[in-house]
């Protein structure tokens, strides 16, 4: 019995180490190569294979600065200054969730969201959150802020099977993300809390309010050079 328990523990530890090695090697590769697909994209596609994934990579310098400012205003205003975790944001989210008695605020940074999208599944659990923390820690030490934001903008979801700002700009406005105006950039950034819903409800009051807030604060955000 003791030998069996030891064997199970060794297998469990080996699996954990293998996952960390996979994440580490992937981050090394993606430092200099485009991210063609993410775990989030694959899971989304496997759940409904009737429609293809729409995704097109665009280099950082070819993405409108309007969108860079908008996405940080909407998702992570302290992106430049933290090391992967916004402790004030996490504390605020916990307080709001406690007040409401349910999860109404997240507090995840761009880095945390990207780590989850690249490697993990969407269902909340302590195991997933722990692995997200480890992957975020690795990413922040291996990639520049510029690279993190570049990959995030190219992999985040904007609607059903619609990923990356270039695909979103073409879908919603028929233009490249390089040419997004302030209004257009703010709208795309405002979609992110629930892109599949807002894709078909573009005049939703919450969406329009979020867009106005992003427009108000986007010029105050600092983006990587």
UniProtKB/Swiss-Prot annotation:
GO terms for biological process: cell wall organization; peptidoglycan biosynthetic process; regulation of cell shape. This is Biosynthetic peptidoglycan transglycosylase. One of its GO terms (molecular function) is pentosyltransferase activity. It is found in: Cell inner membrane. It comes from the Bacteria. GO terms for cellular component: peptidoglycan-based cell wall; plasma membrane. Keywords: Cell inner membrane, Cell membrane, Cell shape, Cell wall biogenesis/degradation, Glycosyltransferase, Membrane, Peptidoglycan synthesis, Transferase, Transmembrane, Transmembrane helix. It is a single-pass membrane protein. It catalyses: [GlcNAc-(1->4)-Mur2Ac(oyl-L-Ala-gamma-D-Glu-L-Lys-D-Ala-D-Ala)](n)-di-trans,octa-cis-undecaprenyl diphosphate + beta-D-GlcNAc-(1->4)-Mur2Ac(oyl-L-Ala-gamma-D-Glu-L-Lys-D-Ala-D-Ala)-di-trans,octa-cis-undecaprenyl diphosphate = [GlcNAc-(1->4)-Mur2Ac(oyl-L-Ala-gamma-D-Glu-L-Lys-D-Ala-D-Ala)](n+1)-di-trans,octa-cis-undecaprenyl diphosphate + di-trans,octa-cis-undecaprenyl diphosphate + H(+). The chain crosses the membrane at residues 8-28. The gene is mtgA. The lineage of its organism: Bacteria, Pseudomonadati, Pseudomonadota, Gammaproteobacteria, Moraxellales. It holds the Pfam family Transgly. NCBIfam families: mono_pep_trsgly. Pathway: Cell wall biogenesis; peptidoglycan biosynthesis. It comes from Acinetobacter baumannii (strain ATCC 17978 / DSM 105126 / CIP 53.77 / LMG 1025 / NCDC KC755 / 5377). Its main location: membrane. Belongs to the glycosyltransferase 51 family. Peptidoglycan polymerase that catalyzes glycan chain elongation from lipid-linked precursors. It is an enzyme of class 2 (transferase). Its EC number is 2.4.99.28.
């Amino acid at each position: 019995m003791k030998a069996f328990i030891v064997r199970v523990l060794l297998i469990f530890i080996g699996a954990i180490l293998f996952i960390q090695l996979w994440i580490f090697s992937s981050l090394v590769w993606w430092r200099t190569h485009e991210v063609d697909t993410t775990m989030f994209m694959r899971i989304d596609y496997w759940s409904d294979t009737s429609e293809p994934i729409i995704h097109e990579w665009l280099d950082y310098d070819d993405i409108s600065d309007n969108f860079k400012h908008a996405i940080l205003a909407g998702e992570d205003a302290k992106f430049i200054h933290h090391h992967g975790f916004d402790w004030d944001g996490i504390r605020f989210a916990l307080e709001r969730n406690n007040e409401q008695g349910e999860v109404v605020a997240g507090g995840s940074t761009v880095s945390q969201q990207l780590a989850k999208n690249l490697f993990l599944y969407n269902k909340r659990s302590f195991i997933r959150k722990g692995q997200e923390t480890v992957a975020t820690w690795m990413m922040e030490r291996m990639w520049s802020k510029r690279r993190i934001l570049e990959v995030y903008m190219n992999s985040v979801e904007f609607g059903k099977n619609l990923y990356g700002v270039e695909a979103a700009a073409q879908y919603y406005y028929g233009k490249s993300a390089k040419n997004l105006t302030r209004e257009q950039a703010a709208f795309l950034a405002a979609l992110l809390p629930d892109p599949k819903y807002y894709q078909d409800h573009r005049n939703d009051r919450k969406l329009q309010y979020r867009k106005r807030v992003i427009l108000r604060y986007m010029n105050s955000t600092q983006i990587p050079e």
